[in-house]
Amino acid sequence: MKGVAPFFGIKAGPRRELLKEHMAANGVPTVDELPTVVRDAFTCQERELHHTAVDLLTKQARKLGPEQLPWIEDALTAKSWWDTVDALATHVIGTILKRHPEAIPTWNERWITSADLWLNRTAILFQNRWKADTDLDLLFTNIDRHAARQEFFLRKAIGWALRE
């Protein structure tokens, strides 16, 4: 993670506790407020703000639908790195698409055919927590489309998806 972006130096536990205290005092952002909160967090350089935005989205994931995916995709591609991309793919996007399987073909095709490595990684990983509900045909098709690529982060995603 060194060199990817600056950090405040706040570890995950204390950062999450600060978020919890803030939400207790100020309320949880509504679904309508989330796009602004997330975009604002991702315009900042410090990674803790990106992680906080991901934590907020993870907590609200069951309230989100496919209509939120365009601005969630913006977060995926803003200052992309494996930590935020993986959390968004598996905990947020995976939750949304499992609840709204009709949206999978459109979003999967968009991401798996993208020139953006992080969107490709998202298409490979979004089913990771689905266990027995994983669409193996879709997963293997996604993997086959990128199996020859040598990028470290794609190869790691393929390995992780296969282990799950």
Q: Predicted segment positions?
A:
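Surface-facing alpha-helical segments and adjacent helix-coil boundary elements at the starts of domains
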Residues: 1-164
